From Swiss-Prot:
It comes from Halalkalibacterium halodurans (strain ATCC BAA-125 / DSM 18197 / FERM 7344 / JCM 9153 / C-125) (Bacillus halodurans). GO terms for molecular function: 1-deoxy-D-xylulose-5-phosphate synthase activity; magnesium ion binding; thiamine pyrophosphate binding. Signal peptide: none annotated. This is 1-deoxy-D-xylulose-5-phosphate synthase. Thiamine diphosphate binds at H72, G113, H114, S115, G145, A146, N173, Y284, E366.
């Protein structure tokens, strides 16, 4: 059928099983074709086609609330709710968002992007329903990877205690982005092979009834036998003990099995957890056979061969970080690395190949990773926690309370710092400077290129004065020559890239090329601009700031971070605190709003951070030049 005609999920409710199976095949082909051009989260969505069809067949969205954890697996939901015609612009500037978006559709009742939030949101909605006296169903769909997150476990505990009518669909594909780790993953592994829980439970109850319960010690012994049998024979007891009715495992690609269990859950009082087994990448062989997470989120690819289309490019910043860390670790046994379920994205999977005993993937658990790093540091090791800027937010209290307060030697390698593009507002790494720079003991650096990055990694390893963060962007470097010998960069020192007499631009990282081009444009108007690589965001280069302030030149601070509370604010604070009240200073950075999806270049133009926009802004601070005769 024409998927663009699916303007409402009610249209599939009257379909036969055969028609739904045909629709599932058409949706898979649609996704494979569309995402081969736009890129996106292919593997997760191919795995939930039948599950999404079953949910929309049995429940009445948007009255019934479907909450997608992380949200990257909601493409099928978007197709069924009238958005198939927008997939040519998936994750493109001003196009269809890759995650649920409340202002995009009434069927997107909760926005996600980070993991492990759905159960808490579902608990809130179920509680509100009961307080208002309405009767809608609340269903949270969460993956086995996201279920390892501490917030999800906190919510399970609360939901089970309160006994709210709420359905949790556990989408178990044995992977999140990378293969899952941890004890809970092992519990789910045993459940996958345990057979149907409800049948086992009924058989067990029959067996227990045959155990006599007569007086005294014999009665106590009988109860112990009953408990032992229960734990021995019924694998679903983990969730039952949390207060849930457990259903499953259910074949996530069998519509009959899905429908039967969803119907049972719908009429069951109290919280229900349906354990659904799915195959990530179902229906497309390259994605089905992916064991590393390559097909979780992809760019352009060739459908026939499954070849990912990548243009030749210099090494990525993540790759340079990991290679440098390996190089140093060969001679420094103190170095250990941590990741929170992102070994591939951070490139620590390469570190793990060489140092498997010194690399720790803790799962989706940034809080735990941060404090574990602190524990390692107290014992004389040098822990390196590689984490995306947007995900470090999840471990903020631990950064404050456990690391900075104790002044522990933990190295935070902050990946994806700055705008990240297509993943949009939930993933832009623009807040870390603002939330880190005011913390006592924290140091923050950012390199201008990949060569400076390797020196900063070395500097951070050698630093013994407490916590230090080196932030670096998504994407590739510039292909410049890399120094063979690593050296320390003095913390608190800046670099003069270009001398000038009319104004000064203070910038760092990805904004340096923008500033260089802006200064060229201004030079054509007769202006001479001084350009500073402010690579040490904290501490500032106070000696240079004194000299700049005394020169009397206008100052422009330029950063690809939230302008409020970040680097520019620090410079203004310095001028104010030292009595330089006459220094004309202009801040430029990310405005006070969340930045949506699009290419980085499109987003920079939208928020006013292109070279011509920077040049125009700085020119307003400068006296007009007299035209030469």
């Amino acid at each position: 059928m024409d998927l663009e005609k699916l303007h409402d999920p009610s249209l599939i409710k009257s379909m036969t099983k055969q028609e739904l199976e045909q629709l599932a095949e058409e949706i898979r082909q649609f996704l494979i074709e569309k995402l081969s051009i736009t890129g996106g989260h292919l593997g997760p969505n191919l795995g939930v086609v039948e599950l999404t069809l079953a949910l929309h067949s049995l429940f009445d969205s948007p009255k019934d609330k479907l909450i997608w954890d992380v949200g990257h697996q909601a493409y099928v939901h978007k197709i069924l709710t009238g958005r198939a015609g927008q997939f040519d612009q998936l994750r493109q500037y001003k196009g269809l968002c890759g995650f649920p978006k409340r202002d995009e559709s009434e069927h997107d009742v909760w926005e996600t992007g980070h993991s492990s939030t759905s159960l808490s949101a579902a608990m809130g909605m179920a509680t509100a329903r009961d307080l208002k006296g309405t009767d809608e169903n609340v269903i949270a769909i969460i993956g086995d990877g996201a279920l390892t997150g501490g917030m999800a476990l906190e919510a399970l505990n609360h939901i089970g205690h309160e006994q709210k009518d709420l359905i949790v669909v556990l989408n178990d594909n044995e992977m999140s982005i990378a293969p899952n780790v941890g004890a809970l993953h092992n519990v789910l592994g045993r459940l996958r092979t345990a057979g149907k829980y409800q049948k086992a439970k009924e058989d067990l109850e029959m067996l227990i009834k045959k155990i006599p319960a007569f007086g005294g010690k014999l009665a106590q012994a009988a109860e112990r036998v009953k408990d032992s049998l229960k734990y021995l024979l019924v694998s679903g007891i983990f969730f039952e003990e949390m207060g849930f009715t457990y259903l499953g495992p259910v074949d996530g690609h069998d519509l009959d099995d899905l429908m039967e269990n969803l119907k049972y859950a719908k009429k069951t009082k109290g919280p229900v957890l349906i354990h659904v087994l799915t195959k990530k990448g179902k229906g497309y062989a390259p994605a089905e056979n992916d064991e590393k997470g390559t097909w979780h989120g992809v760019g352009h690819y060739k459908i026939e061969s499954g070849e990912l289309v990548k243009k030749p490019a210099p090494p990525s910043y993540s790759g340079v970080f990991a290679e440098t860390l390996k190089k140093i670790a060969r001679n420094d046994p103190r170095i250990v690395a941590l990741t929170a379920a992102m070994p591939g994205g951070t490139k620590l999977d390469q570190f793990a190949k060489e140092f498997p005993d010194r690399m720790f993937d803790v799962g989706i658990a940034e809080q735990h990773a941060t404090t574990m790093a602190g524990g390692l540091a107290t014992q004389g090791l040098k822990p390196v926690f590689a984490v995306y800027s947007t995900f470090l937010q999840r471990g903020y209290d631990q950064v404050v309370h456990d690391i900075c307060r104790q002044n522990l030697n933990v190295f935070f390698a902050i990946d994806r710092a700055g705008l990240v593009g297509a993943d949009g507002e939930t993933h832009q790494g623009v807040f870390d400077i603002a939330y880190l720079r005011h913390l006592p003991n924290m140091k923050i650096l950012m390199p201008k290129d990949e060569n400076e990055l390797q020196h900063m990694v070395y500097t951070a390893i050698q630093y013994e004065g407490g916590p230090i963060a080196v932030r670096y962007p998504r994407g590739n470097g510039y292909g410049i020559k890399m120094d063979e010998v690593l050296k320390e960069i003095p913390i608190g020192s800046w670099e003069v890239l270009q001398e000038g007499t009319d104004a000064c631009i203070l910038t760092f990282g990805t904004m340096i090329p923008v500033a260089e081009q802006a200064s060229k444009e201004l030079s054509q108007q007769g202006y001479s601009i001084r350009l500073i690589n402010a690579r040490s965001v904290k501490p500032l280069d106070e000696a240079m700031l004194h000299e700049i302030a005394k020169s009397g030149r206008p100052v422009l601070t330029l950063e690809e971070t939230a302008v409020q509370g970040s680097f520019g604010s620090a410079v203004l604070e310095f001028f104010h605190d030292h009595g330089y009240h006459n220094v004309v200073t202009q801040r430029m950075g990310i405005p006070d709003r969340f930045i949506e999806h699009g290419s980085v270049s499109e987003l920079l133009e939208e928020i006013g951070l292109t070279s011509s926009q920077v040049a125009n802004q700085l020119s307003k601070l400068l006296p007009r030049k007299q035209k030469r005769a």
